[in-house]
Protein backbone atom coordinates (compact mmCIF):
# COMPACT_ATOMS: atom_id res chain seq x y z
CA UNK A 1 0.00 0.00 0.00
CA UNK A 2 1.30 3.44 -0.88
CA UNK A 3 1.15 6.12 1.76
CA UNK A 4 -0.96 9.20 1.10
CA UNK A 5 -0.62 10.59 4.62
CA UNK A 6 1.46 10.30 7.75
CA UNK A 7 0.27 9.76 11.30
CA UNK A 8 0.95 12.89 13.32
CA UNK A 9 2.11 13.06 16.91
CA UNK A 10 3.23 9.43 17.18
CA UNK A 11 5.84 8.92 19.90
CA UNK A 12 5.79 5.13 20.13
CA UNK A 13 5.12 2.16 17.87
CA UNK A 14 3.74 -1.01 19.42
CA UNK A 15 3.73 -4.32 17.58
CA UNK A 16 2.09 -7.69 17.84
CA UNK A 17 4.77 -10.40 17.98
CA UNK A 18 4.06 -13.59 16.03
CA UNK A 19 3.20 -12.91 12.40
CA UNK A 20 4.06 -9.22 12.69
CA UNK A 21 7.68 -8.96 13.88
CA UNK A 22 8.74 -12.60 13.86
CA UNK A 23 7.89 -15.74 11.93
CA UNK A 24 7.55 -18.35 14.66
CA UNK A 25 5.43 -20.71 12.55
CA UNK A 26 8.33 -23.16 11.94
CA UNK A 27 8.84 -23.71 15.68
CA UNK A 28 5.14 -23.72 16.54
CA UNK A 29 4.47 -26.20 13.75
CA UNK A 30 7.41 -28.39 14.73
CA UNK A 31 6.21 -28.50 18.35
CA UNK A 32 2.79 -29.70 17.23
CA UNK A 33 4.15 -32.06 14.61
CA UNK A 34 6.35 -33.77 17.20
CA UNK A 35 3.17 -34.78 18.97
CA UNK A 36 1.98 -36.53 15.82
CA UNK A 37 5.33 -38.22 15.23
CA UNK A 38 5.49 -39.39 18.85
CA UNK A 39 2.17 -41.12 18.26
CA UNK A 40 3.27 -42.81 15.07
CA UNK A 41 1.27 -40.45 12.88
CA UNK A 42 2.51 -39.00 9.61
CA UNK A 43 4.29 -35.66 9.71
CA UNK A 44 2.42 -32.70 8.25
CA UNK A 45 4.07 -29.98 6.14
CA UNK A 46 4.70 -26.54 7.62
CA UNK A 47 2.27 -25.14 5.03
CA UNK A 48 -0.55 -26.85 6.93
CA UNK A 49 0.41 -25.23 10.23
CA UNK A 50 1.39 -21.74 9.06
CA UNK A 51 -2.10 -20.24 8.51
CA UNK A 52 -3.05 -21.15 12.09
CA UNK A 53 0.18 -20.04 13.76
CA UNK A 54 -1.42 -16.86 15.05
CA UNK A 55 -3.89 -18.93 17.07
CA UNK A 56 -1.13 -20.53 19.17
CA UNK A 57 -1.82 -23.86 20.86
CA UNK A 58 -5.46 -23.82 19.81
CA UNK A 59 -4.52 -23.48 16.17
CA UNK A 60 -1.67 -25.96 16.24
CA UNK A 61 -3.70 -28.67 17.97
CA UNK A 62 -6.57 -28.10 15.56
CA UNK A 63 -4.22 -28.75 12.63
CA UNK A 64 -2.38 -31.68 14.21
CA UNK A 65 -5.39 -33.51 15.64
CA UNK A 66 -8.54 -31.76 14.47
CA UNK A 67 -9.56 -31.05 18.07
CA UNK A 68 -11.08 -27.93 19.61
CA UNK A 69 -10.66 -26.63 23.19
CA UNK A 70 -13.95 -28.29 24.13
CA UNK A 71 -12.54 -31.77 23.56
CA UNK A 72 -11.68 -33.65 26.79
CA UNK A 73 -8.14 -34.37 25.53
CA UNK A 74 -7.39 -30.78 24.62
CA UNK A 75 -5.88 -29.59 27.92
CA UNK A 76 -3.44 -32.51 28.11
CA UNK A 77 -2.45 -31.99 24.48
CA UNK A 78 -2.01 -28.27 25.10
CA UNK A 79 0.42 -28.88 27.95
CA UNK A 80 2.36 -31.35 25.82
CA UNK A 81 2.49 -28.80 23.01
CA UNK A 82 3.70 -26.11 25.43
CA UNK A 83 6.46 -28.40 26.68
CA UNK A 84 7.60 -29.17 23.13
CA UNK A 85 7.50 -25.51 22.15
CA UNK A 86 9.39 -24.38 25.24
CA UNK A 87 12.30 -26.60 24.19
CA UNK A 88 12.64 -24.92 20.78
CA UNK A 89 11.43 -21.33 21.15
CA UNK A 90 13.92 -19.83 18.71
CA UNK A 91 15.31 -22.89 16.92
CA UNK A 92 13.78 -21.82 13.59
CA UNK A 93 12.16 -18.51 14.51
CA UNK A 94 13.40 -15.37 12.79
CA UNK A 95 12.42 -11.76 12.20
CA UNK A 96 10.57 -11.10 8.97
CA UNK A 97 12.67 -9.52 6.22
CA UNK A 98 12.90 -5.80 6.80
CA UNK A 99 11.93 -5.87 10.48
CA UNK A 100 15.44 -5.27 11.84
CA UNK A 101 15.86 -2.30 9.52
CA UNK A 102 12.42 -0.98 10.49
CA UNK A 103 13.23 -1.14 14.19
CA UNK A 104 16.59 0.53 13.62
CA UNK A 105 14.86 3.37 11.79
CA UNK A 106 12.27 3.78 14.54
CA UNK A 107 14.98 3.90 17.21
CA UNK A 108 17.09 6.23 15.09
CA UNK A 109 14.16 8.62 14.79
CA UNK A 110 13.94 8.85 18.57
CA UNK A 111 10.67 6.93 18.82
CA UNK A 112 10.03 4.30 21.46
CA UNK A 113 8.76 0.87 20.53
CA UNK A 114 7.48 -2.26 22.16
CA UNK A 115 5.53 -5.49 21.91
CA UNK A 116 1.98 -6.34 22.91
CA UNK A 117 1.23 -10.02 22.33
CA UNK A 118 -1.29 -12.63 23.42
CA UNK A 119 1.60 -15.06 23.91
CA UNK A 120 2.02 -15.84 27.62
CA UNK A 121 5.04 -14.49 29.49
CA UNK A 122 6.25 -18.09 29.90
CA UNK A 123 7.24 -17.94 26.23
CA UNK A 124 7.41 -14.23 25.44
CA UNK A 125 10.13 -13.35 27.93
CA UNK A 126 12.69 -16.08 27.09
CA UNK A 127 12.03 -15.66 23.37
CA UNK A 128 12.55 -11.90 23.34
CA UNK A 129 15.57 -12.23 25.63
CA UNK A 130 17.14 -14.69 23.19
CA UNK A 131 16.70 -12.49 20.10
CA UNK A 132 18.91 -9.36 19.79
CA UNK A 133 16.10 -7.63 17.89
CA UNK A 134 14.32 -6.86 21.17
CA UNK A 135 17.23 -5.30 23.04
CA UNK A 136 15.96 -1.80 22.27
CA UNK A 137 12.29 -2.48 23.12
CA UNK A 138 10.95 -0.20 25.84
CA UNK A 139 8.02 -2.39 26.82
CA UNK A 140 6.88 -5.99 26.37
CA UNK A 141 3.34 -6.88 27.40
CA UNK A 142 2.35 -10.55 27.28
CA UNK A 143 -1.06 -12.16 27.04
CA UNK A 144 -1.18 -12.73 30.79
CA UNK A 145 0.31 -9.39 31.89
CA UNK A 146 -3.22 -8.01 32.37
CA UNK A 147 -6.45 -9.83 33.27
CA UNK A 148 -7.60 -9.60 29.65
CA UNK A 149 -5.87 -10.47 26.37
CA UNK A 150 -6.55 -8.91 22.97
CA UNK A 151 -9.03 -8.06 21.50
CA UNK A 152 -9.59 -6.38 24.88
CA UNK A 153 -7.72 -3.04 24.97
CA UNK A 154 -6.23 -3.68 28.44
CA UNK A 155 -2.82 -4.95 27.22
CA UNK A 156 -2.38 -1.94 24.93
CA UNK A 157 -3.42 0.47 27.65
CA UNK A 158 -0.91 -1.21 29.96
CA UNK A 159 1.84 -0.69 27.38
CA UNK A 160 0.93 3.00 27.11
CA UNK A 161 0.94 3.26 30.90
CA UNK A 162 4.42 1.75 31.12
CA UNK A 163 5.61 4.13 28.40
CA UNK A 164 4.00 7.03 30.29
CA UNK A 165 2.20 8.08 27.12
CA UNK A 166 -1.40 8.69 26.21
CA UNK A 167 -2.69 5.89 23.93
CA UNK A 168 -3.39 8.33 21.10
CA UNK A 169 0.35 8.88 20.67
CA UNK A 170 1.03 5.14 20.33
CA UNK A 171 0.56 3.33 17.03
CA UNK A 172 -0.33 -0.38 17.06
CA UNK A 173 0.65 -2.77 14.26
CA UNK A 174 -0.71 -6.32 14.01
CA UNK A 175 -1.50 -9.12 11.59
CA UNK A 176 -4.83 -10.25 13.05
CA UNK A 177 -8.24 -8.61 13.25
CA UNK A 178 -8.14 -8.83 17.04
CA UNK A 179 -5.08 -6.54 16.97
CA UNK A 180 -6.99 -3.86 15.10
CA UNK A 181 -10.05 -4.24 17.33
CA UNK A 182 -7.87 -3.91 20.44
CA UNK A 183 -5.95 -0.94 19.08
CA UNK A 184 -9.10 0.89 18.09
CA UNK A 185 -10.68 0.23 21.50
CA UNK A 186 -7.55 1.61 23.16
CA UNK A 187 -7.76 4.78 21.09
CA UNK A 188 -4.57 4.07 19.13
CA UNK A 189 -3.99 4.53 15.41
CA UNK A 190 -3.85 1.04 13.88
CA UNK A 191 -1.93 -0.57 11.03
CA UNK A 192 -2.74 -4.01 9.61
CA UNK A 193 0.27 -6.13 8.67
CA UNK A 194 -1.01 -7.92 5.58
CA UNK A 195 2.23 -9.87 5.21
CA UNK A 196 1.46 -11.89 8.35
CA UNK A 197 -0.11 -15.31 8.74
CA UNK A 198 -3.63 -14.26 7.75
CA UNK A 199 -2.89 -11.59 5.17
CA UNK A 200 -2.87 -13.84 2.12
CA UNK A 201 -6.22 -15.51 2.71
CA UNK A 202 -8.13 -12.80 4.57
CA UNK A 203 -9.47 -9.43 3.42
CA UNK A 204 -7.49 -7.24 5.80
CA UNK A 205 -9.29 -4.15 4.47
CA UNK A 206 -12.42 -5.43 6.23
CA UNK A 207 -10.68 -4.90 9.57
CA UNK A 208 -10.91 -1.13 9.01
CA UNK A 209 -7.40 -0.39 10.22
CA UNK A 210 -6.16 3.14 9.64
CA UNK A 211 -3.56 1.80 7.21
CA UNK A 212 -2.40 -1.49 5.67
CA UNK A 213 1.17 -2.51 4.89
CA UNK A 214 2.32 -5.44 2.77
CA UNK A 215 5.92 -5.40 4.04
CA UNK A 216 7.43 -4.22 7.35
CA UNK A 217 9.48 -1.40 5.87
CA UNK A 218 6.39 0.25 4.40
CA UNK A 219 5.41 1.33 7.90
CA UNK A 220 7.99 4.10 7.64
CA UNK A 221 5.83 5.73 4.95
CA UNK A 222 3.24 6.46 7.62
CA UNK A 223 5.57 7.84 10.28
CA UNK A 224 6.94 11.35 10.47
CA UNK A 225 10.66 10.65 10.26
CA UNK A 226 13.43 13.26 10.72
Where do the language-model regions lie?
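Short helix-capping segments at alpha-helix termini
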Residues: 37-42, 68-70, 109, 132-136, ...
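Hydrophobic/aromatic residues within well-ordered alpha-helical segments
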Residues: 28, 53-57, 77-85, 120
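Asp-based, Mg2+/Mn2+-dependent phosphohydrolase catalytic module
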Residues: 1-12, 47, 107, 120-121, ...
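Residue-level detector of anion-binding/catalytic polar loops
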Residues: 42, 112, 189
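Substrate-recognition element of Asp-dependent hydrolases with the DxDx(T/V) motif
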Residues: 20, 32, 99-129
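Helix-loop "lid/cap" segments that line or gate small-molecule binding pockets
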Residues: 35-36, 56-70, 127, 159-160
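Active-site neighborhood of HAD-like aspartate-dependent phosphohydrolases
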Residues: 2-51
Amino acid sequence: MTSTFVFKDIDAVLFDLDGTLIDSAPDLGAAADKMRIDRGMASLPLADYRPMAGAGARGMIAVAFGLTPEHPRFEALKEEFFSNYEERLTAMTYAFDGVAELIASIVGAGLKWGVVTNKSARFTLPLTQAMPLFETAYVIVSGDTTPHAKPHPAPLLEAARQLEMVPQRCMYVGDDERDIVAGRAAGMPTVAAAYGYLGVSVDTAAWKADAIITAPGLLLNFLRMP
